[in-house]
Amino acid sequence: MALQLWALTLLGLLGAGASLRPRKLDFFRSEKELNHLAVDEASGVVYLGAVNALYQLDAKLQLEQQVATGPALDNKKCTPPIEASQCHEAEMTDNVNQLLLLDPPRKRLVECGSLFKGICALRALSNISLRLFYEDGSGEKSFVASNDEGVATVGLVSSTGPGGDRVLFVGKGNGPHDNGIIVSTRLLDRTDSREAFEAYTDHATYKAGYLSTNTQQFVAAFEDGPYVFFVFNQQDKHPARNRTLLARMCREDPNYYSYLEMDLQCRDPDIHAAAFGTCLAASVAAPGSGRVLYAVFSRDSRSSGGPGAGLCLFPLDKVHAKMEANRNACYTGTREARDIFYKPFHGDIQCGGHAPGSSKSFPCGSEHLPYPLGSRDGLRGTAVLQRGGLNLTAVTVAAENNHTVAFLGTSDGRILKVYLTPDGTSSEYDSILVEINKRVKRDLVLSGDLGSLYAMTQDKVFRLPVQECLSYPTCTQCRDSQDPYCGWCVVEGRCTRKAECPRAEEASHWLWSRSKSCVAVTSAQPQNMSRRAQGEVQLTVSPLPALSEEDELLCLFGESPPHPARVEGEAVICNSPSSIPVTPPGQDHVAVTIQLLLRRGNIFLTSYQYPFYDCRQAMSLEENLPCISCVSNRWTCQWDLRYHECREASPNPEDGIVRAHMEDSCPQFLGPSPLVIPMNHETDVNFQGKNLDTVKGSSLHVGSDLLKFMEPVTMQESGTFAFRTPKLSHDANETLPLHLYVKSYGKNIDSKLHVTLYNCSFGRSDCSLCRAANPDYRCAWCGGQSRCVYEALCNTTSECPPPVITRIQPETGPLGGGIRITILGSNLGVQAGDIQRISVAGRNCSFQPERYSVSTRIVCVIEAAETPFTGGVEVDVFGKLGRSPPNVQFTFQQPKPLSVEPQQGPQAGGTTLTIHGTHLDTGSQEDVRVTLNGVPCKVTKFGAQLQCVTGPQATRGQMLLEVSYGGSPVPNPGIFFTYRENPVLRAFEPLRSFASGGRSINVTGQGFSLIQRFAMVVIAEPLQSWQPPREAESLQPMTVVGTDYVFHNDTKVVFLSPAVPEEPEAYNLTVLIEMDGHRALLRTEAGAFEYVPDPTFENFTGGVKKQVNKLIHARGTNLNKAMTLQEAEAFVGAERCTMKTLTETDLYCEPPEVQPPPKRRQKRDTTHNLPEFIVKFGSREWVLGRVEYDTRVSDVPLSLILPLVIVPMVVVIAVSVYCYWRKSQQAEREYEKIKSQLEGLEESVRDRCKKEFTDLMIEMEDQTNDVHEAGIPVLDYKTYTDRVFFLPSKDGDKDVMITGKLDIPEPRRPVVEQALYQFSNLLNSKSFLINFIHTLENQREFSARAKVYFASLLTVALHGKLEYYTDIMHTLFLELLEQYVVAKNPKLMLRRSETVVERMLSNWMSICLYQYLKDSAGEPLYKLFKAIKHQVEKGPVDAVQKKAKYTLNDTGLLGDDVEYAPLTVSVIVQDEGVDAIPVKVLNCDTISQVKEKIIDQVYRGQPCSCWPRPDSVVLEWRPGSTAQILSDLDLTSQREGRWKRVNTLMHYNVRDGATLILSKVGVSQQPEDSQQDLPGERHALLEEENRVWHLVRPTDEVDEGKSKRGSVKEKERTKAITEIYLTRLLSVKGTLQQFVDNFFQSVLAPGHAVPPAVKYFFDFLDEQAEKHNIQDEDTIHIWKTNSLPLRFWVNILKNPHFIFDVHVHEVVDASLSVIAQTFMDACTRTEHKLSRDSPSNKLLYAKEISTYKKMVEDYYKGIRQMVQVSDQDMNTHLAEISRAHTDSLNTLVALHQLYQYTQKYYDEIINALEEDPAAQKMQLAFRLQQIAAALENKVTDL
C-alpha cells in the first residue's frame, strides 16, 4: 500500500512539472490588420473582420472560410456605384471592416466596411462566402458605417419590440467625408417600400447640425430591457474639452423622442489627481443582482496624476434612475434648467412648462416634449482599478459563483485578470502576455460556454482559457493563485472550478482560493513523543470536510504501513508507528511526516511533521555539559546521577534524578580565576563547584582536547578547587578561548570553566603596540629581547624608543593646504593623546585623532603655505621627537589646470573630461574636487592628467570648470565646458532583432557627435505570468549591455543588437540607448524595439545536400521575422553563398561555381572533406550539414558531338548573330540611358517631396503644439474688421479709422458728438440712406476706391443694427440685379466691387464669417501659412530680389544653386534673464533675416504685434574675448565695382553652435555701420553707384559688357538653364499638398458646418434666379463664386494678416498667391486647356484642379440641400453679432468720415432729398441741414 501511495505522489509531482510548462495559446494570424471579432455562442464559431477580408474560424481558431472584401476602386468623395468615367479620382482602396455583428435568430452576419460610403452586407452564419444581401446603388439612404478608417462605428442587432422588426442600431462619428448621421436605426429585412439597411423610418436618424463643431468617437453599444445604449467620446470645441457620454433611447421609438444623453466621469481615488478623460472600451455584465456597465478610461501625461488608465463601474439601475431624474427635471423643471440641458448635435432646448409626471406618462418621450435631450449633470464613478504608464484598451466581465472577474486588455499586449470585490475594490491576480508590445484591441469576447476568452491584436487572435485551475497541483498553489474560478476539491485532491467538484456543496469539500485555507493539522496531542514509547496521536484538523459513512481516513506515519484513523469531531486519532527513523547526528529528535489520506482513490488530505525525541542524544548537544544539555531541552528528559545518563521522564521519579528544566541542580564546576592565561607560563587557576555530592572523594582532572593536556585537580580548604596549567603555546592568534573539561573516572562532569589563552608577542612588533595591549594581559616591552612578552618573562623593562617615520602619503600638497597627510612608521604612540605636535615641511599639521592607529599611523591636515617648498616631517610623541629621513620629504606646489577636452557634452552628463595642466598630481585623488557650475564632476583618474565624468546640469550653456585641492580652489585661466542639448532619437530601423543579436540597428537623430560612449542596453524583467519550461529553473532579471557601436556621426549611430535570453517572450524587455549620461528609450510613434525568438533550421537529410551547383535550399521557421535578404549571410565552406530568396520558411542562395574547401578539414573521413553549409543571422551561425557538387561529365566525346563539318557553319551563324546583337545592344543602351535619366529625375522629385514632407510634418508638430498651448493668434474682432475694411486704403495702418483719432477741438467735441449721433439717426432712415448712396454713385468723381471706402465706413456706422444694414444691402442688390438682367448680362454681376452694394456684401460676409474663421477654418489656414513660411525659410531667400529656393511661384524662384548650410545658434536676449535659446538659421542669411528668425523663435509665445522690429534690435557675436556687432552692410562688406554684397553669417564666419546676443538699443547707440536695415528699405543704396545684391545678381546686370556682346543663343541658354529649377516647384508643392488639401476641405467640404450667412445668401441668389427665370446653372454658379469664394476666401487666403496676428513676407505672399489662384480656378466651370506654354502656376496644380472643382460643385449642392435659414433666424444671428462687437468699433469716427462725403456733395444730396416725396414727408433735408449747421459751426438760412 505504501509503495502505491509513493507512486501516486511521484505521478503527482510529474504532473506538477508538466503543468508548470507554459501553455501554448491557440492563435490565428491574418495577413492583414484585424478590425473586429464576434463569436457565435451556440456554435462557437469565431468571425473576424479585417482589412479586405472576412474570416470564419472554428472554436480552436482553425480556418473554415475566408472571403475577400477588397480592395476596390473607390474614392471617399464619390457616391457609389463607382465608375471610373464618373469618378476620376477613384483608385484601388482598402476596405476596413467597420462593423461585424451577429443576428443568430435569422442565422446571418452583418458586416459593414469603409468602402462605398460605408455600405453593409448580410451573409450566412454557416458560410460567410454566401452573401444574402448587398446593394451599392441605393444612394445615401444605404450609407451606414463611417468611410473614414479613423472614425469608429458601433452597432447592435435587436428587434423593435416583442415580435417586432429585426433592426440594426448604429452609432458613428462624423467623419470629414461622412453623411453627418450620428445615430440611426436600420432595417435588416426588406419591406415593400424599403430595402435592407435603410433607415427604419424617416425620423430614425440623428444628423449633426450644420454648425456642429463637435466630433464623436463611439466606443460601445448595448441593450438593457426596452432600451438601447451608446457609449461615446465627444471632443467639444466650445469650450475645448473631451467628454464621455452615455446615450439611451427606447428600442420601440422610431422618432427618437426618447433620445437622452448624459456625461459619464471616472474619477481617480486620489483627490489631487485629474479625472480619467477618454473612455477606451466598455462592456456590460450581470455579476449579481443587477447589470453593470464596466468602462476603462485613459488619462494623458499632461494631466495631473500622470498618464494611466482606470476601470470604473456604473450599475445600470443607477444609470436609469439618473436619466429619469434628468428627464423629469427638464420636462417639469424651471426655465433655468437650460444651463444644465442642451440639444445634442447642435441647437437649443426649451425645458420646463410641462405637466408633472410627464416623464412617467411618456416613458419614451413624445413629440410635444423636448427632444433630443442632453444633460451635463451625469453620473460619476470612482475607479476601482488604476494603472500608471499604460492604457487599458479592452474590457469584458464574467461572473463565477457570484464572483465578478474582469478581463482587461492593455496597450503592451497583455490580458490582466482582475477580481472585483463586493466592497468596491479590485485585485489583479494574473497577467497573460498574448503578444509583446502589441495593443490588445477593443473586441475582447468570451466564448458561449464562458470557458474561453478571445483576444485580438493587430494581426492575430488568441484563445485563452479563463482559468487554469488544473495547472495547480497542490492546495497551497491553488490557494496562492487567488483565481476566483478555482478552489481545492478535497475528495478529488485537485484544483477545480466549483461545478467540477462532485461534493462541492458539502461543508469544506471545495475550498475557494480567495477565502478558505487548505485542510491542515492545527495541533497535536501529545505535542511530541519519545521514540521508545508507543501510543496514540490526536490531530486537530481544520477545516475537516464532512465525512459520510463511506468515507474512511487513513494515517500514514513515515514509511510505516497505513492504518485506519478514528474521527471524533474535528479530531483525527492515529497510532504511533512501530518503526521510527534513526535520529540524525547533532540532533535530539527526528520529525516523521503524518499523512492523512482518503481511502477512496488514495486522495491526499493533509500532512503534519510530528517529532519523536531521543534523550540519549540530548546529553551530547552541548560540549562538556551533559546534565544541563539533558534537562534544559524542550522534551521531558531527566538526568540520572547514579548511572550518569539521560533518560525519558518517569511518572514516579526516584532519588538521584535531576528533573527536566532543573539544570541548576546539575553537578557542575564554574567561576575560574584568572580568566586570562599567558602563553609559555605556568599559571595557577582556581575555580568553584556545586551540587557535587555524587563526586565527593573522587579523583578529578581538568584538561583540553584542543591543546592536548590534562592536569589533576586539588581541593582547597576553602572548598574551592585549583590546578596549574602547563606552559601552553598557540601562535596562530593573539588569543584562544578554551572550554576546559572536568572528568571523574573518565566521565564528564558539567564544566563552565571558560578561560582565554593570550600571546603578548602576537601583532605587537614595537614598544607602543606592546604598551597599548589590554592591561589584563600584563604585557611589557623587553628591551633586551626587543619584543613584547608577559611581564614575568622579562627581567628588566625599558621605556619606548623615539618615533620612527618610514613613509608619508601623499608626498606633495597644494599651497592652499587642507589635505590629509598620512604618516606611517613605528612607535608613534600608544594612544591619540600621546601625539603632541606634528610639523610637515615646516608647516603645522592638525592631528586627526579619529584616524589614528596605535603606533603605526598618524593622520593630520596640513595648513596653507605661501610659496612652493620642500621639507621633512617631525612628530612629537609624548615628548619624544621623531624626524623623517632625507628620502621622506613633503613638497608644497601649486597645481594649475590649463585646458580641458572635450569642450562640450550633453546636458545629461556622463562626458569623460581630460584636464591638462601642471602639477595636477598634487595630493591624492580624494583631495581633488572638480565642479562645473557647482555640479560635481566625479574624478576617475588621478595623475599628470585628471579625468572626471560630468554630472547632469539643469540648464544648457557654458559652464566654468573649477578645480580645488583640499577645499581650496586653484587658479583657473578661464576653462569652460559647454552643456549642449541632449541627443534626440527620431527613428530607428530595423524594428526588431532575433534574440541572439548581432543585427545592425541604425538609429537616426541629432546631436550624436557630442557623445563619447554609446551602448545599446536591454533591461529584461521576467513576466509574472510566465512559467519556465524546466522545473527548478526560474527566470532572473538582468541587464544586458551591448558591445560598442560600429559607426556614428552627428545624425546616425549603428549598433549591433546585444543578445538576450533565448525566450524573449518570457521577459518584459526595455531597450535603451545609453549615450554617456543620457538614456533614451528605443521607441518612436511606430512602436518600441522588439526581440523575437531565434529562427529554427532543418538540418540536411543525411547530413549532406547533393547536386547543389545552382541553388541551395534551406528550410526553417520564422526566418524573415527579424532578418532581410540583404542582411542574411550563408557560406559554403570558406566562401560566400549569394543570397537569392528569404521567406518565412525558405532560404535560397547561389553557391560558388567551384566547390570550395571546407572551413575545418577532417583527415580521415572523406565525407567531412565536403564544405559545410553555414547560415549566419547576426551573431548566430547554424551548420545545416555539408554540400556536394555535381561533378558528373558527359561520357560522349566532344569530337562526336561537334564534327568538323558543323563547326564552320556554326562560326558563320555566330558571327552574324554577334553583329546583329552588337547593334541591338547599342540601341538598347541608349534607350536605357534615357529611361534611367527620366526615372532618376522622377525618383529624385518624389524622394525630395517625401523627405521634405516628413521634415515639415516633424517641424510642424512643434508649431501644432504651440497652437494647442497658446492657441491660434486670431485677431480680436475690431482689429480684424479694421484690417479687412481699411488696411487696403491709401493711408494703410495710418488711416483714421484704424487710429481712431478725430481732429476736433476739445471745446467743440460735445457739440460735434451730439450732431454725429443725430447723423446716425438720419442714416437709420432707409429713404435717406438709399438717396444718399444713389446720389454719391451718380457723381462722376466718386471713384471705385471711394465707393469701397464709403461702404466700409457705412458698415461700421450701421454695425449696431446689422439687420437694418442687411435690409439696405438687400434692396440695393435687387436694384443691381435688375440692371444686369435688363442689360442681359447677369453673369457679370458681382464680378468686381464697382458699386457700394458689392463692397457692402464683402463686408457683410467678413462680419458673418469671423466666428467661423475663428472656430473652424482658421486653424487649417494658419497651419498652411506656417507651413509655407517654414518651407520658404528652410532654404535660401534672396533679401534683395525677394526670391526663394523653395516657393510655389515661378517668378519668385531663385534660379541658381546657392551653397548653404543650416546652423543652430544659441541666442541670449539681453536684460530678459532667460536661458540661451537655440535658433535654426542658414549661413547664407542676411543679418536682418537672422534677426527676424531669432525674433520669431524668441517671442513665439507673444503676439506678433508685440514683437520688436528687426531694425530696433542689435545682434552681437562674441567669438572670443572680443564682441562684434553684426549688420547687413558695414565697412567689411564685399565690393565688386559698383556692386556691394549684403553681409551674411557666412561672411562673418559664424559657425554652428555660436552664441549671439540680441539687445534692444536706441538708434543713436548703434555704430554707424550697423544702422543699416534690409537692402530693400535703403533708398540711398538703390542709387546707380551703390547697387547691392545678396545671393544672385540680376541676370541682366551681372556683366553689362558681356551682355552686350552676348548672342541671343547664349540668352536662350541662360533661360533654359533657369527652367531646370522648376522641379523645385513640384517638390515644394508635394511637401505642402496635405496642408493645401486640408484648407480646401475646411472651406469647401459639405460635411463641415456651413455658416448660416452663406446658406441664407445662397438661397437668396437661388430665389432671384428663379424669380427672373434664369435657368443657366453657370450663371448661378458664377454668382455664388463671386459672392463668397472670390469675394471673401481669396482675400483672406492672400492676406492672412487680416485674420491672424502675423507678418507676411513677400516670398510667403508669392506662394499664397499661387494657392489663391488655384482656388479661383477651382471655382470656375470653364475648362482650362493646358499646353507647354501654359503658366507654371497653372501646370503645378493641373492634376488636382478637377478634384477641387468637384469639391466646389459638391459644396454648392450640399448647401442647397440644407435646411433653410429663415429671416428670423438670420436676424437673431446678426443681432447677436451687433450686441457682441459694436461697442469695440470706432462708430463715431466712421460717422464723422461719412459726413465728409455729405459735406463734399451737400447740394446734390439736399436736391435729391427734396425731390423724393417720401423724404419730403419725413423732412430729411431739413434734418440734414440742422446737422450740417452743428458740425460746420455756421448759421443756416433755416
Curated annotation (Swiss-Prot):
Q: Where is the IPT/TIG domain?
A: 803-893, 895-980, 983-1092
Parts of the chain that traverse the membrane: 1198-1218
Membrane topology, from the record: Single-pass type I membrane protein
- Which residue numbers delimit the Sema domain? 20-466
| Spans within the Cytoplasmic topological domain | 1219-1838
Which residues pair up as cystines? 78-87, 112-120, 250-364, 266-312, 330-351, 469-486, 475-518, 478-495, 489-501, 555-574
Which key words tag this protein in UniProt? Cell membrane, Developmental protein, Disulfide bond, Glycoprotein, Membrane, Phosphoprotein, Receptor, Repeat, Signal, Transmembrane, Transmembrane helix
Which residues get modified to Phosphoserine? Answer: 1236, 1244, 1570
Q: Which SUPFAM superfamilies match?
A: E set domains, GTPase activation domain, GAP, Plexin repeat, Sema domain
Q: Topological domain, Extracellular: which ranges? A: 20-1197
Annotated GO biological process: brain development; excitatory synapse assembly; homophilic cell adhesion via plasma membrane adhesion molecules; negative regulation of cell adhesion; neural tube closure; neuroblast proliferation; positive regulation of axonogenesis; positive regulation of neuron projection development
Question: In the UniProt record, which is one GO cellular component term?
Answer: plasma membrane
Q: Which GO terms describe its molecular function?
A: semaphorin receptor activity; signaling receptor activity; transmembrane signaling receptor activity
For the site Cleavage, which positions are given? Answer: 1164-1165
The positions flagged as glycosylation sites are: 127, 242, 391, 402, 528, 733, 759, 795, 844, 1002, 1049, 1068, 1099
Location comes to: Cell membrane
Signal peptide segment: 1-19
A Pfam match is: PSI_Plexin-B
Cross-referenced InterPro entries: Ig-like_fold, Ig_E-set, IPT_dom, Plexin, Plexin_cytoplasmic_RasGAP_dom, Plexin_RBD, Plexin_repeat, PSI
Oligomeric state and interaction partners are given as: Monomer, and heterodimer with PLXNB1. Interacts with SEMA4C, SEMA4D and SEMA4G. Interacts with MET. Interacts with ARHGEF11 and ARHGEF12. May also interact with MST1R.
Provide the function of this protein: Cell surface receptor for SEMA4C, SEMA4D and SEMA4G that plays an important role in cell-cell signaling. Plays a role in glutamatergic synapse development and is required for SEMA4A-mediated excitatory synapse development. Binding to class 4 semaphorins promotes downstream activation of RHOA and phosphorylation of ERBB2 at 'Tyr-1248'. Also acts as a cell surface receptor for angiogenin (ANG); promoting ANG endocytosis and translocation to the cytoplasm or nucleus.
Q: Which family does it belong to?
A: Belongs to the plexin family.
> PANTHER family annotated for this entry?
PLEXIN, PLEXIN-B2
Q: Kindly provide the name given to this protein in its UniProt entry.
A: Plexin-B2
Query: Which organism was this protein described from?
Result: Homo sapiens (Human)
